Amino acid sequence: MISFNKQSGDFMKTLKILILSLATVFAFNSFVLADTVTVTGVAYGTTLTTEQTVLPDGNTLVRNTNHSIWVQEGLPEGFPNKLSAHCQDMSLRSPEFANLGITWSCIATDVDGDGFINVGGDPNPDLSGCFYKSVAGWGKYAGVTRSGKCAFGGNISADGSDWSLTWSGDFTTP
């Protein structure tokens, strides 16, 4: 009897260790499920309103609202590759209209009504420091982080009201 109880005790101890080990594996596995992919994209936009204020120092404060369609590649399954975005930007321009700093915020939504708030900017006169980052999301974008580099893609219309912006960066799901 004593040896049976000892075996039973050893078995229970082994079973507890096995259960604890499996629970640990599942807990760590949930951390591993977060996935980061590189996405690229192009925004095709139209400036809807522009307000320019010449300041006493000769610089110009520019405020724009725009609408753009974002076409992306490299997204994880379940995330549509097209988004509709409503954005606002503010920039300070020199008397020669060189960029002295620009910042923007966008609300981007997909066909399901899910979306996120994206912000970005560029402090460089040649627009070489363009960056973006998501700050909040809802629906399938809740907990998703996006960040990367962007570049002005050029004007599409002669008056500059239609334009493109390209980007590449990380898209991390929770």
Where are these regions (language model features)?
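Short, Lys/Arg-enriched N-terminal segments with co-localized hydrophobic residues
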Residues: 1-11
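Bacterial N-terminal signal peptides that target proteins for export
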Residues: 10-19
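Beta-strand-enriched cores of mature, soluble protein domains
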Residues: 33-174
